[in-house]
Amino acid sequence: MVADAYGRPLKDLRIAVTPECNLDCFFCHMEGATESGPMRPGSWSPVLSVEDYDIIGEAASRLGVDSFKLTGGEPLIRGDVDKIVAVLARYGEVSMTTNGILLPLKASSLKRAGLARVNVSLHSISEEVYEKITRRRAVKLALKGVEAALKAGLRVKVNMVLLRGLNEGEFWRLLRLAEDLGFDLQVIEVHPAGRGRKVLSSFRRPIDVVEERLSSMAVAVETGRLHNRRVYRLPSGVRVYLVDPVENPVFCMGCYRVRLTWDGRLLPCIYWKGPYPSVAEALKRGGSREEKVWRVMKILLEANALRRPTYLFRLHDGQEPQAPSTGRGLRLTLPGKAKAERLAYSTLKAPLIEG
Protein backbone atom coordinates (compact mmCIF):
# COMPACT_ATOMS: atom_id res chain seq x y z
CA MET A 1 0.00 0.00 0.00
CA VAL A 2 1.19 3.52 -0.80
CA ALA A 3 0.35 6.81 0.91
CA ASP A 4 0.77 10.48 0.08
CA ALA A 5 2.93 13.04 1.88
CA TYR A 6 0.12 13.56 4.41
CA GLY A 7 -0.14 9.89 5.33
CA ARG A 8 -3.37 9.25 3.43
CA PRO A 9 -3.35 5.80 1.79
CA LEU A 10 -4.32 5.26 -1.84
CA LYS A 11 -7.21 2.79 -1.70
CA ASP A 12 -9.74 3.92 -4.30
CA LEU A 13 -9.68 4.66 -8.04
CA ARG A 14 -12.61 6.68 -9.38
CA ILE A 15 -12.92 6.02 -13.11
CA ALA A 16 -14.93 8.15 -15.55
CA VAL A 17 -15.53 5.80 -18.48
CA THR A 18 -17.28 8.36 -20.72
CA PRO A 19 -17.95 12.12 -20.90
CA GLU A 20 -21.37 11.48 -22.47
CA CYS A 21 -24.64 11.78 -20.57
CA ASN A 22 -28.35 11.54 -21.33
CA LEU A 23 -29.08 14.29 -18.79
CA ASP A 24 -27.73 17.83 -18.49
CA CYS A 25 -27.61 18.81 -14.80
CA PHE A 26 -26.76 22.49 -14.43
CA PHE A 27 -24.36 21.93 -11.49
CA CYS A 28 -22.52 18.83 -12.82
CA HIS A 29 -18.93 18.70 -11.57
CA MET A 30 -17.81 16.43 -14.47
CA GLU A 31 -15.39 14.72 -12.07
CA GLY A 32 -13.23 17.86 -12.08
CA ALA A 33 -12.01 17.16 -15.62
CA THR A 34 -13.70 20.09 -17.36
CA GLU A 35 -15.86 23.12 -16.60
CA SER A 36 -18.04 22.47 -19.63
CA GLY A 37 -21.00 20.12 -19.47
CA PRO A 38 -21.30 16.50 -20.59
CA MET A 39 -21.24 15.47 -24.24
CA ARG A 40 -24.31 14.18 -26.02
CA PRO A 41 -24.57 10.40 -26.47
CA GLY A 42 -22.91 9.25 -29.67
CA SER A 43 -20.51 12.19 -29.95
CA TRP A 44 -17.43 10.53 -28.43
CA SER A 45 -15.26 7.47 -29.09
CA PRO A 46 -13.63 5.58 -26.19
CA VAL A 47 -9.94 6.25 -25.53
CA LEU A 48 -9.35 3.34 -23.15
CA SER A 49 -10.40 -0.22 -24.00
CA VAL A 50 -11.63 -3.02 -21.74
CA GLU A 51 -8.12 -4.50 -21.92
CA ASP A 52 -6.68 -1.13 -20.85
CA TYR A 53 -8.96 -1.08 -17.80
CA ASP A 54 -7.86 -4.62 -16.98
CA ILE A 55 -4.22 -3.48 -16.97
CA ILE A 56 -5.10 -0.38 -14.94
CA GLY A 57 -6.97 -2.51 -12.41
CA GLU A 58 -4.04 -4.87 -11.96
CA ALA A 59 -1.55 -2.01 -11.64
CA ALA A 60 -3.72 -0.24 -9.07
CA SER A 61 -4.29 -3.41 -7.05
CA ARG A 62 -0.55 -4.05 -6.82
CA LEU A 63 -0.26 -0.65 -5.14
CA GLY A 64 -3.01 -1.45 -2.63
CA VAL A 65 -6.12 -0.08 -4.36
CA ASP A 66 -9.08 -2.31 -3.52
CA SER A 67 -12.06 -0.23 -4.63
CA PHE A 68 -13.13 1.04 -8.06
CA LYS A 69 -15.96 3.52 -8.70
CA LEU A 70 -17.23 3.89 -12.28
CA THR A 71 -18.66 7.28 -13.24
CA GLY A 72 -19.01 9.52 -16.30
CA GLY A 73 -20.82 11.37 -17.71
CA GLU A 74 -23.28 8.54 -17.50
CA PRO A 75 -21.37 5.24 -17.38
CA LEU A 76 -24.33 3.13 -18.57
CA ILE A 77 -24.21 4.86 -21.96
CA ARG A 78 -21.00 2.99 -22.67
CA GLY A 79 -21.96 -0.29 -24.34
CA ASP A 80 -19.11 -2.34 -22.88
CA VAL A 81 -19.47 -1.09 -19.31
CA ASP A 82 -20.43 -4.57 -18.07
CA LYS A 83 -17.14 -5.90 -19.46
CA ILE A 84 -15.25 -3.10 -17.70
CA VAL A 85 -16.99 -4.07 -14.46
CA ALA A 86 -16.03 -7.71 -14.98
CA VAL A 87 -12.31 -7.06 -15.44
CA LEU A 88 -12.08 -4.62 -12.53
CA ALA A 89 -13.98 -6.99 -10.23
CA ARG A 90 -10.92 -9.27 -10.37
CA TYR A 91 -9.01 -6.69 -8.34
CA GLY A 92 -11.47 -5.25 -5.85
CA GLU A 93 -14.99 -4.05 -5.16
CA VAL A 94 -16.63 -2.29 -8.11
CA SER A 95 -19.40 0.26 -7.65
CA MET A 96 -20.98 2.83 -9.94
CA THR A 97 -22.56 6.27 -9.88
CA THR A 98 -25.40 6.56 -12.41
CA ASN A 99 -28.55 8.58 -13.04
CA GLY A 100 -30.39 5.27 -13.10
CA ILE A 101 -32.32 5.79 -16.32
CA LEU A 102 -30.77 2.77 -18.05
CA LEU A 103 -30.67 0.51 -14.99
CA PRO A 104 -33.89 -1.36 -15.90
CA LEU A 105 -32.04 -2.61 -18.99
CA LYS A 106 -28.66 -3.26 -17.39
CA ALA A 107 -28.94 -3.90 -13.64
CA SER A 108 -29.07 -7.69 -13.89
CA SER A 109 -26.15 -7.99 -16.31
CA LEU A 110 -24.08 -5.61 -14.18
CA LYS A 111 -24.77 -7.70 -11.09
CA ARG A 112 -23.68 -10.84 -12.95
CA ALA A 113 -20.52 -9.03 -14.10
CA GLY A 114 -19.54 -8.33 -10.50
CA LEU A 115 -20.98 -4.90 -9.68
CA ALA A 116 -21.49 -4.67 -5.91
CA ARG A 117 -23.49 -1.47 -5.49
CA VAL A 118 -24.80 1.63 -7.23
CA ASN A 119 -25.21 5.27 -6.31
CA VAL A 120 -28.24 6.64 -8.15
CA SER A 121 -28.32 10.41 -8.60
CA LEU A 122 -31.89 11.44 -7.80
CA HIS A 123 -32.08 15.08 -6.74
CA SER A 124 -35.87 15.30 -6.77
CA ILE A 125 -38.90 13.02 -7.05
CA SER A 126 -41.00 15.88 -8.41
CA GLU A 127 -41.22 15.72 -12.21
CA GLU A 128 -41.17 19.51 -12.47
CA VAL A 129 -38.17 20.03 -10.17
CA TYR A 130 -36.30 17.07 -11.67
CA GLU A 131 -36.67 18.64 -15.11
CA LYS A 132 -35.39 22.01 -13.85
CA ILE A 133 -32.28 20.28 -12.50
CA THR A 134 -31.58 17.76 -15.28
CA ARG A 135 -33.32 19.43 -18.25
CA ARG A 136 -35.23 16.24 -18.97
CA ARG A 137 -38.55 14.84 -17.77
CA ALA A 138 -37.24 11.48 -16.66
CA VAL A 139 -37.84 11.11 -12.92
CA LYS A 140 -40.11 8.08 -13.43
CA LEU A 141 -37.36 6.35 -15.40
CA ALA A 142 -34.84 7.09 -12.65
CA LEU A 143 -37.19 5.68 -10.01
CA LYS A 144 -37.66 2.53 -12.08
CA GLY A 145 -33.87 2.31 -12.19
CA VAL A 146 -33.68 2.33 -8.39
CA GLU A 147 -36.27 -0.44 -8.21
CA ALA A 148 -34.46 -2.48 -10.90
CA ALA A 149 -31.16 -2.24 -9.04
CA LEU A 150 -32.76 -3.40 -5.80
CA LYS A 151 -34.50 -6.27 -7.60
CA ALA A 152 -31.17 -7.34 -9.15
CA GLY A 153 -29.65 -7.61 -5.68
CA LEU A 154 -27.43 -4.53 -5.85
CA ARG A 155 -26.89 -2.37 -2.79
CA VAL A 156 -28.36 1.04 -3.56
CA LYS A 157 -27.56 4.50 -2.27
CA VAL A 158 -29.44 7.48 -3.67
CA ASN A 159 -27.41 10.68 -4.08
CA MET A 160 -29.26 13.95 -3.53
CA VAL A 161 -27.46 17.26 -4.06
CA LEU A 162 -29.12 19.95 -1.94
CA LEU A 163 -29.96 22.98 -4.07
CA ARG A 164 -31.13 26.18 -2.46
CA GLY A 165 -34.54 27.24 -3.67
CA LEU A 166 -35.15 24.02 -5.61
CA ASN A 167 -35.24 20.78 -3.65
CA GLU A 168 -34.54 21.58 0.01
CA GLY A 169 -37.98 20.42 1.10
CA GLU A 170 -37.78 17.11 -0.70
CA PHE A 171 -35.23 15.41 1.52
CA TRP A 172 -37.87 14.07 3.89
CA ARG A 173 -39.96 12.72 1.00
CA LEU A 174 -36.88 10.93 -0.32
CA LEU A 175 -36.14 9.59 3.14
CA ARG A 176 -39.64 8.11 3.39
CA LEU A 177 -39.12 6.49 -0.02
CA ALA A 178 -35.77 5.11 1.16
CA GLU A 179 -37.44 3.53 4.17
CA ASP A 180 -40.24 2.09 2.01
CA LEU A 181 -37.94 0.58 -0.64
CA GLY A 182 -34.85 -0.19 1.44
CA PHE A 183 -32.04 1.98 0.08
CA ASP A 184 -29.61 4.35 1.79
CA LEU A 185 -29.53 8.09 1.17
CA GLN A 186 -26.56 10.41 0.63
CA VAL A 187 -27.01 14.17 0.93
CA ILE A 188 -24.38 16.25 -0.85
CA GLU A 189 -23.48 19.94 -0.97
CA VAL A 190 -22.76 21.45 -4.38
CA HIS A 191 -19.10 20.92 -5.34
CA PRO A 192 -17.20 24.00 -6.58
CA ALA A 193 -15.93 22.00 -9.56
CA GLY A 194 -17.01 21.78 -13.19
CA ARG A 195 -20.28 23.64 -13.68
CA GLY A 196 -20.68 23.74 -9.92
CA ARG A 197 -18.01 26.41 -9.69
CA LYS A 198 -20.27 28.94 -11.42
CA VAL A 199 -23.45 28.18 -9.48
CA LEU A 200 -22.01 27.55 -6.01
CA SER A 201 -22.89 30.94 -4.54
CA SER A 202 -26.44 30.83 -5.90
CA PHE A 203 -27.42 27.25 -5.10
CA ARG A 204 -25.21 25.94 -2.30
CA ARG A 205 -27.28 24.90 0.71
CA PRO A 206 -25.32 23.64 3.73
CA ILE A 207 -26.54 20.25 4.88
CA ASP A 208 -27.16 21.45 8.42
CA VAL A 209 -30.67 22.19 7.13
CA VAL A 210 -31.38 18.47 7.57
CA GLU A 211 -28.66 17.40 10.01
CA GLU A 212 -30.10 18.77 13.24
CA ARG A 213 -33.31 16.79 12.89
CA LEU A 214 -31.45 13.73 11.64
CA SER A 215 -29.19 13.71 14.67
CA SER A 216 -32.19 13.64 16.99
CA MET A 217 -33.72 10.72 15.06
CA ALA A 218 -30.60 8.57 14.74
CA VAL A 219 -29.93 5.47 16.81
CA ALA A 220 -26.21 5.62 15.95
CA VAL A 221 -23.65 7.94 14.38
CA GLU A 222 -20.96 6.32 12.24
CA THR A 223 -18.13 7.38 9.95
CA GLY A 224 -17.94 6.49 6.26
CA ARG A 225 -14.72 4.83 5.07
CA LEU A 226 -14.15 7.53 2.46
CA HIS A 227 -13.91 11.25 3.28
CA ASN A 228 -14.89 10.81 6.95
CA ARG A 229 -18.54 11.28 6.02
CA ARG A 230 -20.95 11.52 8.93
CA VAL A 231 -23.49 8.70 8.75
CA TYR A 232 -26.74 8.66 10.71
CA ARG A 233 -28.33 5.23 11.16
CA LEU A 234 -32.07 5.54 11.67
CA PRO A 235 -34.45 3.19 13.52
CA SER A 236 -35.63 1.82 10.15
CA GLY A 237 -32.08 0.67 9.37
CA VAL A 238 -31.63 3.26 6.63
CA ARG A 239 -28.32 5.10 6.71
CA VAL A 240 -28.06 8.76 5.72
CA TYR A 241 -24.59 9.89 4.59
CA LEU A 242 -23.65 13.57 4.68
CA VAL A 243 -21.12 14.96 2.19
CA ASP A 244 -19.97 18.52 2.90
CA PRO A 245 -16.63 19.05 1.12
CA VAL A 246 -16.41 22.85 1.03
CA GLU A 247 -13.81 24.28 3.43
CA ASN A 248 -13.83 20.99 5.34
CA PRO A 249 -10.38 19.66 6.29
CA VAL A 250 -11.93 16.57 7.90
CA PHE A 251 -13.37 15.65 4.50
CA CYS A 252 -9.93 15.97 2.91
CA MET A 253 -8.35 13.92 5.72
CA GLY A 254 -10.38 10.92 4.58
CA CYS A 255 -9.60 11.15 0.86
CA TYR A 256 -8.03 7.88 -0.29
CA ARG A 257 -8.57 8.22 -4.02
CA VAL A 258 -7.19 9.28 -7.37
CA ARG A 259 -9.45 10.01 -10.35
CA LEU A 260 -9.03 8.65 -13.89
CA THR A 261 -10.68 10.70 -16.63
CA TRP A 262 -12.32 9.30 -19.77
CA ASP A 263 -9.31 10.38 -21.82
CA GLY A 264 -6.81 8.61 -19.57
CA ARG A 265 -5.53 11.43 -17.34
CA LEU A 266 -5.10 11.11 -13.58
CA LEU A 267 -6.40 13.79 -11.21
CA PRO A 268 -5.04 13.74 -7.64
CA CYS A 269 -8.10 15.77 -6.55
CA ILE A 270 -11.40 16.89 -8.07
CA TYR A 271 -10.13 20.49 -7.79
CA TRP A 272 -6.77 19.72 -9.44
CA LYS A 273 -5.56 22.07 -12.20
CA GLY A 274 -2.56 20.12 -13.52
CA PRO A 275 -0.16 18.64 -14.36
CA TYR A 276 -2.02 15.48 -15.35
CA PRO A 277 -0.06 12.20 -15.42
CA SER A 278 -1.39 10.23 -18.41
CA VAL A 279 -2.21 6.54 -18.22
CA ALA A 280 -3.33 6.67 -21.85
CA GLU A 281 0.10 7.79 -23.02
CA ALA A 282 1.78 5.06 -20.99
CA LEU A 283 -0.45 2.41 -22.57
CA LYS A 284 0.11 3.69 -26.11
CA ARG A 285 3.79 2.82 -25.93
CA GLY A 286 3.06 -0.88 -26.43
CA GLY A 287 5.15 -3.72 -25.04
CA SER A 288 4.14 -6.79 -23.08
CA ARG A 289 1.28 -6.77 -20.61
CA GLU A 290 3.72 -6.83 -17.70
CA GLU A 291 5.59 -3.84 -19.12
CA LYS A 292 2.31 -1.94 -19.43
CA VAL A 293 1.32 -2.82 -15.87
CA TRP A 294 4.62 -1.49 -14.54
CA ARG A 295 4.32 1.72 -16.57
CA VAL A 296 0.81 2.32 -15.25
CA MET A 297 2.03 1.67 -11.71
CA LYS A 298 4.69 4.32 -12.23
CA ILE A 299 2.09 6.83 -13.48
CA LEU A 300 -0.17 6.06 -10.52
CA LEU A 301 2.74 6.69 -8.16
CA GLU A 302 3.37 10.03 -9.89
CA ALA A 303 -0.26 10.99 -9.34
CA ASN A 304 -0.11 9.83 -5.72
CA ALA A 305 2.94 12.05 -5.14
CA LEU A 306 0.87 15.03 -6.34
CA ARG A 307 -2.00 14.43 -3.90
CA ARG A 308 -2.58 17.40 -1.61
CA PRO A 309 -5.57 18.14 0.62
CA THR A 310 -7.47 21.17 -0.65
CA TYR A 311 -8.31 22.25 2.88
CA LEU A 312 -6.06 21.95 5.93
CA PHE A 313 -5.97 23.31 9.47
CA ARG A 314 -3.74 26.30 10.20
CA LEU A 315 -0.92 25.31 12.50
CA HIS A 316 -0.99 28.39 14.72
CA ASP A 317 -4.51 27.93 16.10
CA GLY A 318 -5.74 24.69 14.58
CA GLN A 319 -9.29 25.98 14.15
CA GLU A 320 -9.92 27.72 10.85
CA PRO A 321 -9.71 25.70 7.64
CA GLN A 322 -8.03 27.25 4.63
CA ALA A 323 -6.82 26.22 1.20
CA PRO A 324 -3.00 26.12 1.28
CA SER A 325 -0.82 28.03 -1.17
CA THR A 326 2.25 26.15 0.05
CA GLY A 327 2.82 23.12 2.25
CA ARG A 328 4.60 25.10 4.96
CA GLY A 329 3.10 25.60 8.39
CA LEU A 330 0.15 23.30 7.76
CA ARG A 331 -0.94 19.98 9.15
CA LEU A 332 -3.57 17.36 8.45
CA THR A 333 -4.54 16.28 11.96
CA LEU A 334 -7.53 17.01 14.12
CA PRO A 335 -6.80 20.20 16.11
CA GLY A 336 -6.92 20.00 19.87
CA LYS A 337 -9.34 22.91 20.23
CA ALA A 338 -11.48 22.56 17.12
CA LYS A 339 -14.82 24.30 17.56
CA ALA A 340 -16.42 23.56 14.21
CA GLU A 341 -19.77 21.81 14.60
CA ARG A 342 -18.82 19.24 11.99
CA LEU A 343 -16.14 17.96 14.38
CA ALA A 344 -18.29 17.91 17.48
CA TYR A 345 -19.26 14.25 17.27
CA SER A 346 -15.57 13.28 16.86
CA THR A 347 -14.62 11.63 13.60
CA LEU A 348 -12.06 9.54 15.41
CA LYS A 349 -14.57 7.98 17.81
CA ALA A 350 -17.50 7.20 15.52
CA PRO A 351 -17.52 3.59 14.24
CA LEU A 352 -16.01 3.23 10.77
CA ILE A 353 -18.25 1.66 8.11
CA GLU A 354 -17.84 0.72 4.45
CA GLY A 355 -19.74 2.40 1.64
Swiss-Prot record:
SUPFAM superfamilies tied to this protein: Radical SAM enzymes
Cofactor comment text: Binds 2 [4Fe-4S] clusters. Binds 1 [4Fe-4S] cluster coordinated with 3 cysteines and an exchangeable S-adenosyl-L-methionine and 1 [4Fe-4S] cluster coordinated with 3 cysteines and the GTP-derived substrate.
The EC number(s) this enzyme carries: 4.1.99.22
Gene Ontology terms describing biological process: Mo-molybdopterin cofactor biosynthetic process
Known pathway: Cofactor biosynthesis; molybdopterin biosynthesis
Gene3D superfamilies listed in its UniProt record: Aldolase class I
Top enzyme category: lyase
GO molecular function: 4 iron, 4 sulfur cluster binding; cyclic pyranopterin monophosphate synthase activity; GTP 3',8'-cyclase activity; GTP binding; metal ion binding; S-adenosyl-L-methionine binding
Sites where the protein binds [4Fe-4S] cluster 1: 21, 25, 28
Co-factor requirement: [4Fe-4S] cluster
PROSITE patterns noted in UniProt: MOAA_NIFB_PQQE (PS01305), RADICAL_SAM (PS51918)
Highest taxon above the source species: Archaea
Residue positions binding S-adenosyl-L-methionine: 73, 121
Ranges where the Radical SAM core domain occurs: 5-233
Residue numbers binding [4Fe-4S] cluster 2: 252, 255, 269
Family statement: Belongs to the radical SAM superfamily. MoaA family.
Xref: NCBIfam families: moaA_archaeal, PRK00164.2-1
Function: Catalyzes the cyclization of GTP to (8S)-3',8-cyclo-7,8-dihydroguanosine 5'-triphosphate.
The protein's name: Probable GTP 3',8-cyclase
The organism of origin for this protein: Aeropyrum pernix (strain ATCC 700893 / DSM 11879 / JCM 9820 / NBRC 100138 / K1)
Species lineage: Archaea, Thermoproteota, Thermoprotei, Desulfurococcales, Desulfurococcaceae
